[in-house]
Amino acid sequence: MSYINKPGKTRAWRKMVSRQQVSDVISHGSIVTTKTKAKESQRHVDHLITLAKKNTLASRRAAAAILLGTNQHSADDLLRKLFNELGPKYANRAGGYTRVIKLGNRPGDNTEEAVLQLV
């Protein structure tokens, strides 16, 4: 789950940030983040929705290993939402469950920002 080779950041940090962003997208439907993190998290969200479409015990366990609880929802709530709402919603779609929309640069450090949202 690492998205860039960022000096000063460990693999564990990159993995946790990616897992948290994936959980936030499933919880809220969209997030605002940097373009690089959005592109990487997009891969993982699309993969989780593909697992939700399969709806097997193995796919539920694989998704549970990735999802983290947020302030509003527990990991179990997110798993239910993924398999009961998002899986059936995208059942007839072959892929491309999310989109990244560029927002421009952040005022503080001039980093490109983007919105990662479910289609």
UniProtKB/Swiss-Prot annotation:
Transmembrane ranges, per UniProt, are none
For this chain, one GO molecular function annotation is: structural constituent of ribosome
For the keyword DNA repair, the answer is no
> What are the entry keywords?
Ribonucleoprotein, Ribosomal protein
Q: Which Gene3D superfamilies match?
A: Ribosomal protein L17
SUPFAM superfamilies tied to this protein: Prokaryotic ribosomal protein L17 (SSF64263)
The entry's family comment says:
Belongs to the bacterial ribosomal protein bL17 family.
Would you tell me the protein name for this molecule? Large ribosomal subunit protein bL17
Q: Source species, please?
A: Ureaplasma parvum serovar 3 (strain ATCC 700970)
